[in-house]
């Protein structure tokens, strides 16, 4: 419920006006860097787009993204590994531009790199100014950054052809700026506290848990 409450407050701008920032963060690990053996043939009259099925692998990329909930702007960085050791410094870089904020609410899922002993100790060091909110188990869809990653991947990565890992990383960083210029906007989140409570109270057999 806390996460939904913050999303609803964004619509009234009340949280931002108090000098507080809400940021969602998520990772998309192990994105395959694939080089197609033949160029993709673009769509034309009477013919769908054709993509070569044979490819050469050039490793993987771990994409971490942050979503500034108030304005929908995207922050992106590619990590060498998808683990807590690389996640924690990335969080510092994500939060760095908001040194002016009285408080930052960071929404993340329950991934192992987010809940390890070292990462939890790291979050305690940042507390109380940095308030971490975990999505419920199997509730990562409540994290708006997950929706951002899906939309970003479909628009900028889905039909990619990469001759090296470095080229894909540079494309992601360049595309972040393009996304912020052309598409960034606050998400309209339909799943409200009221809808959640109605569902909770009218669905038999549910196991109650804190959200």
Model regions and ranges:
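Extended, low-complexity cationic-aromatic segments
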Residues: 1-92, 206
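C-terminal domain-tail junction helix/linker
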Residues: 167-211
């Amino acid at each position: 419920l806390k996460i939904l409450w913050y999303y609803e407050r964004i619509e009234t701008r009340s949280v931002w006006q108090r000098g507080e920032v809400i940021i969602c963060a998520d990772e998309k690990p192990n994105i395959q860097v694939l080089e197609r053996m033949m160029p993709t043939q673009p769509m034309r009259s009477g013919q769908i787009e054709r993509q070569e099925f044979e490819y050469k692998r050039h490793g993987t990329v771990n994409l971490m993204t942050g979503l500034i909930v108030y304005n929908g702007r995207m922050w992106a960085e590619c990590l060498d590994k998808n683990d807590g050791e690389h996640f924690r410094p990335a969080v510092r870089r994500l939060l760095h531009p908001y040194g002016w904020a009285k408080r930052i609410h960071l929404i993340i899922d329950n991934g192992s790199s987010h809940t390890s002993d070292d990462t939890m100790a790291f979050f305690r060091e940042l507390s109380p100014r940095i308030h971490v909110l975990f999505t419920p188990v199997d509730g990562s869809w409540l994290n708006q950054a997950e929706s951002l990653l899906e939309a970003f991947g479909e628009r900028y990565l889905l039909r990619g052809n990469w001759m090296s890992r470095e080229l894909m990383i540079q494309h992601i960083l360049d595309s972040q700026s393009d996304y912020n210029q052309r598409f960034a906007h606050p998400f309209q989140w339909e799943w409200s506290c009221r809808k959640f409570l109605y569902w909770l109270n009218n669905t038999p057999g549910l196991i109650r848990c804190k959200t």
